[in-house]
Amino acid sequence: MPLLSVEKINPHTTLLLWKITETEEQLKGQLPENVLKTIVHKNYKSSSRRIEVMATYALLLSYLKKTSVIVHHKSNGQPLLDGFHISISHTNGYACVLLSTQNVVAIDIEYHSDRIARIRSKFLRNDEPFNSIDQLLVIWSAKETLYKYFSADDLMFDEMKVESISKSSLSMINLKTNEKRKVFYSLTSDYVLTYII
């Protein structure tokens, strides 16, 4: 598993990012039986989805230096891991995990694609005048991250607003509660990654 980065964001929070190159069979060989049973029980239809989930478990086991770890999920899909606040995301051959021992966190990763321009009306508000593919990718991912962060609010895209964008972050507001958050981002030719700490 080619780990691209382990970034210690602050003393309590770590961001893990890696490129998934393994086959499903290779990943099965890295996971304990109880983890494989959990994955089989979830009955993922897509092979690529199973690979992403297996890669996430392989990374967590390696990073946490444990022989077993199980990620549980709330009914809304939010992941739970004993001893940590955790957020997980995957896209076309990449996966990321954000772990914190103290604070709620959220993360999203999306592959770089021009398709975002076709769906802009799905996630952009009329008062968000952004046009470039890069801006649209960052905003799409940032709204996915904000949605995860405020998961209890069950936000719709039009209930999240971008107030400003800088070189490495966005200022965003949850319009249901008027709570503001800074969403950090990283943009490459392969993906955009956004997170809240």
Regions picked out by a protein language model, each given a short descriptive name:
Residues M1-V105, I109-I197:
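Core catalytic alpha/beta fold that binds nucleotide/phospho-ligands
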